[in-house]
Design a protein with these regions (language model features):
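Catalytic cores of soluble, metal-dependent hydrolases
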Residues: 1-51, 59-63, 70-75, 146-281
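Short active-site oxyanion
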Residues: 48-50, 128-132
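Short hydrophobic segments within beta-strands
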Residues: 81-83, 134, 185
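Aromatic-lined glycan-binding groove of carbohydrate-active enzymes
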Residues: 128-130, 137-144, 178-182
């Protein structure tokens, strides 16, 4: 496994302004997402596996727009696993804060400012059928209505509680094959704040350490991971680096590090194929 660190992208700072026309800091968010889109697309064109270290989850707009563009060119079917406490399907009409990090899924599905919708050309960048959301437990009423109207597959925490993480991930990963590009968008607030306090928008009742490990291991078992976002980790809110250390452990599992003592049962599963390189955009 060859790792290439592309360093930090450079862009505008946070101007800390009130929303304008329903969006906070739209110009800055557009600027950053264009940078991310171009950086991720460049790595994909070199047949590398891009890893984006954010930053808030609005950066998923640029990252996934680039992945969708690449899939259209390569003929791959896209599957997006969105691991998050929130559905992120707000719009400027629904959001009281105007924060775009609560709107990335809506933007990717065609609901949002034109500057963000068309980053990768066609609008919408993705269709809801390629998206699976896991771990959701905080959704606004209007947002819930939109998610239902779009028919997005949401495996919320009640679903996880009722059937377990193994069954949840089997359902979320169903249909993935050798023609699938698997993109994982991992918002660290997906995790329960008892084990991951270092995020800006904690929501109680998230996956435990072991549930999160199983989630990552099962995605690794597909052998189809092709791009990754890791977002919303905020060291200012962390406790003795607990959240950052946990995120490292989970990403190691996502790349194939196993906690199994027994021989894994891989019947019907594909093994992880090491990518040529990992690039941090």
């Amino acid at each position: 496994l060859k790792v290439v660190d592309r360093g930090n992208l450079a862009g505008p700072g946070n101007p800390v302004q009130a929303p304008a026309n329903g969006y906070r800091h739209l110009d800055e968010v557009v600027f950053w997402n264009r940078l991310v889109h171009d950086a991720v697309l460049a790595e994909l064109r070199e047949e590398r596996l891009p890893v984006l270290l954010g930053g808030d989850h609005s950066l998923g707009i640029g990252s996934i727009s680039a992945v969708a563009r690449h899939c259209r060119t390569s003929g791959k079917r896209l599957r997006v696993l969105w691991l998050d406490a929130h559905a992120d399907f707000n719009t400027h009409e629904l959001s009281p804060s105007g924060n775009l990090h609560g709107m990335p899924v809506a933007c990717l599905c065609g609901f949002g400012p034109p500057e963000l919708l068309a980053l990768a050309g066609p609008v919408p960048a993705i269709t809801p059928d390629c998206l699976r959301q896991v771990g959701v437990r905080s959704v606004d009423p209007g947002e819930r209505r939109l998610v239902h109207e779009q028919g997005i597959d949401v495996f919320d925490m009640r679903h996880v509680d009722e059937v377990g993480m193994r069954k949840t991930m089997e359902e979320a990963l169903e249909g993935i094959d050798s023609d699938t590009h698997l993109h994982v968008s991992f918002d660290v607030d997906f995790l329960d704040p008892e084990i991951a306090p270092g995020v800006g928008t904690t929501v109680p009742g998230g996956p435990t350490y072991r549930e999160a490990q199983l989630c990552m291991e099962m995605m690794a078992d597909t052998g189809r991971l092709a791009s990754l976002d890791i977002v919303e980790l905020n060291p200012a809110f962390d406790v003795r680096n607990r959240t950052a250390s946990l995120a490292v452990d989970l990403v190691e599992s996502l790349f194939g590090k196993s906690t199994l003592m027994r021989q894994p049962d891989v019947r019907g599963r594909k093994q992880l194929h090491a990518p040529r390189a990992v690039a941090s955009a």
